[in-house]
Amino acid sequence: MKSIAVTGYKNFELGIFKKDADEAIYIKETMKRHLVPLIEDGLEWVIISGQLGIELWAGEVVGELKKEAYAIKLAILEPFENQSGNWNEANKIWASEVLTIADYHAFITKRPYENPSQFAARDGFIIDNTDGAILVYDLEKEGSPKFFYDRAKLAKERSDYYLECIDFYALQDVVEDMNQAF
């Protein structure tokens, strides 16, 4: 597997309103624990669309892994131009910080937001151009990742597309593991 998409809940869907909230530490550690074995097995690219929450934290994790000398690259494929246009200043800064980590950046539709079909185009393009996906998504708590999940699940059923969901139980396991380490 050479490329994997990482997506999941937006931070506010998890009740997290600051990029550096305590909960983010656990989310990022969980992602790191899932990405490192894949990188060690040959993963070269992590693909995100630059949305708030799980995706930007994943971008930060890739940056941290690069600093630890892992050979991994980050691509940000935004669904449309000026995705962060309506975000508050703190979130715009967060997105621009993650953008500096990216090895590749492009817009799937080279125009501003027009309608929700641009999100469907994003999902389809990313799934069609990756070998798999890791979602921080719990089937018991629907949210915005459901649309990507449904499409990725179809890809998995039709091919050898890799699909891994990190649910709230997996996150809780990391919280407990990290707290026992103290």
Curated annotation (Swiss-Prot):
A Pfam family matched in the record: YpsA
List the InterPro entries: YspA
Instruction: Family membership, please give it.
Output: Belongs to the UPF0398 family.
What is the name of the protein in this document?
A: UPF0398 protein lwe1908
**Which organism is this protein's natural source?**
Listeria welshimeri serovar 6b (strain ATCC 35897 / DSM 20650 / CCUG 15529 / CIP 8149 / NCTC 11857 / SLCC 5334 / V8)
